[in-house]
Amino acid sequence: VVQLNFEIDDQTPEDLSVALEKIRELPGVLDVNQSLAFGKKGRMMFAVQILVVSQAESDVMAQCFEETTTLGIRKIELDRAILNRSEHIVNVGTEKFRTKRASRPGDMTTKVEIDDIAHLPGIRRRSTKADIENQTSEE
């Protein structure tokens, strides 16, 4: 995995948002993060961090130069540890919810896909989420 880093202080937030969404959709991109930072002369800027599989590094860097105003990109090769994960469908009444289970040392955790419960009203959303996650973690 390669981490690409750069800062932006001369591109509007709206335009950068569009640019990063396009980058996020590229094959091989694992994650895109942006945060606010302070740069030279006390200027506010966006610090951008992109995780990409090694094989896609060149294409993603080219797209970063195309879509953003950055003049340079730092890259770092990373090793990473990944938990075993699996996806499952849980039925609750007539509704189906996607879940992701992770095998942690000595434990199994489950998270409901937020898009599947987002349509539920507040209290029901939270209780449905808790019920599914508690039920499936015990299996």
What are these regions, as identified by a protein language model?
Residues 2-45, 49-139:
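Long, contiguous binding/interaction regions
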